[in-house]
């Protein structure tokens, strides 16, 4: 999961190639993604409209200021705090900047959540747009998922019970009548899995089992492994990235845990809802835009949102989730709303087309 030491050289060369290709005859704009292609804006700006998508403001590609001399005619925009900052330069030069949810657009304008670029982003005005990502609804489709023991759909959830049984068997948890919560995650500070660790001794009292799939930070993996060994009836941890198991977790889980400290968009909550698994999330970024709290809006709710990214707040949301899940009417209504919502790329694609039109017309 670590980057190569010469990533600055790799992506600078790639960006130069992207810019050269974009400026050839027939192209109407160049669309860059994150810091990896951001340097292309130093050549493209002023010659062809530039759209920049930012998926995570924390990753800016900062490198030595000596790289400025290798950029194009607008290299000065990339100098920031005595370094070369590809993402900052592209934000300054882009004709439109797209962040990956409407709420994340609001967050990046604030000093506490703007990763040092909030002032630059405020200068973009209406050229800063928030467009929620979609998911591949063919790949994430419980009615035709080859990773499941049996297909299921919103009008027949019998296959979901079979998926839960298969999941429990695969990860080694004992039989349990209460809800099974799952998490498919990177082990990184952003994702907030460490906020769950103090709750592990309480899981039995909360009538909750948890299965976590994820890899990344070694210390966090060690802590999860230790917690699972100490509480084998309550917590199962699989240290891996395993797409087949991820599908089974989303299908077999009752609740999805996403205690993110920040989440520009998030895909897991949408994937889980496709499978009738109700999300318990922090109230940040794209999680705010996609999960409606059942206690705040029972008629439209799809999950539960913790008021803050800390252990007490997430515990409170979990308590509410276990209670809500235990009510069959609440559970089924939320499952139906999540499974029938349109999480596809159809809507986001049309909003991207509108953003393209604004910069080329």
Give the ranges of each region predicted by the language model:
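Catalytic cores of nucleotide-sugar-dependent glycosyltransferases that transfer UDP/GDP/TDP-activated
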Residues: 1-361
């Amino acid at each position: 999961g670590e980057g190569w030491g010469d990533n600055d050289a790799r992506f600078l060369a790639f960006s130069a190639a992207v810019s050269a290709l974009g400026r050839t005859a027939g192209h109407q704009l160049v669309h860059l993604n994150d810091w990896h292609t951001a340097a292309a804006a130093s050549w493209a700006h002023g010659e062809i409209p530039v759209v920049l998508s930012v998926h995570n403001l924390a990753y800016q590609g900062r490198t030595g200021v000596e790289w400025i001399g290798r950029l194009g005619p607008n290299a000065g925009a990339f100098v920031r705090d005595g370094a070369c900052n590809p993402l900052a330069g592209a934000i300054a030069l882009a004709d439109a900047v797209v962040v990956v949810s409407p709420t994340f657009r609001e967050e990046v304008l604030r000093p506490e959540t703007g990763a040092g670029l909030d002032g630059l982003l405020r200068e973009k005005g209406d050229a800063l747009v928030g467009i929620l990502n979609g998911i591949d609804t063919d790949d994430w489709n419980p009615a035709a998922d080859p990773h499941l023991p049996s297909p299921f759909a919103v009008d027949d959830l019998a296959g979901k019970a079979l998926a839960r049984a298969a999941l429990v068997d695969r990860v080694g948890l004992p039989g349990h009548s209460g809800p099974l919560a799952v998490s498919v995650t990177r082990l990184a500070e952003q994702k907030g899995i460490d906020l769950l660790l103090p709750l592990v001794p309480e899981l039995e009292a909360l009538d909750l089992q948890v299965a976590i799939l994820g890899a990344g930070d070694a210390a966090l993996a060690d802590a999860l492994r230790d917690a699972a060994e100490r509480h084998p009836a309550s917590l199962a941890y699989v240290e891996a990235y395993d797409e087949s198991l991820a599908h089974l977790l989303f299908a077999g889980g009752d609740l999805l845990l996403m205690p993110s400290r920040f989440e520009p968009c998030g895909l897991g909550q949408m994937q889980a809802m496709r499978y009738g698994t109700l999300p318990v999330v922090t109230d940040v970024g794209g999680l705010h835009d996609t999960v409606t709290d059942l206690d705040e809006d029972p008629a439209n709710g799809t999950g539960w949102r913790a008021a803050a990214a800390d252990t007490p707040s997430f515990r409170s949301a979990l308590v509410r989730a276990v209670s809500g899940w235990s009510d069959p009417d609440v559970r089924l209504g939320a499952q139906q709303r999540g499974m029938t919502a349109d999480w596809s790329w159809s809507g986001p694609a049309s909003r991207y087309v509108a953003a393209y039109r604004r910069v080329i017309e």
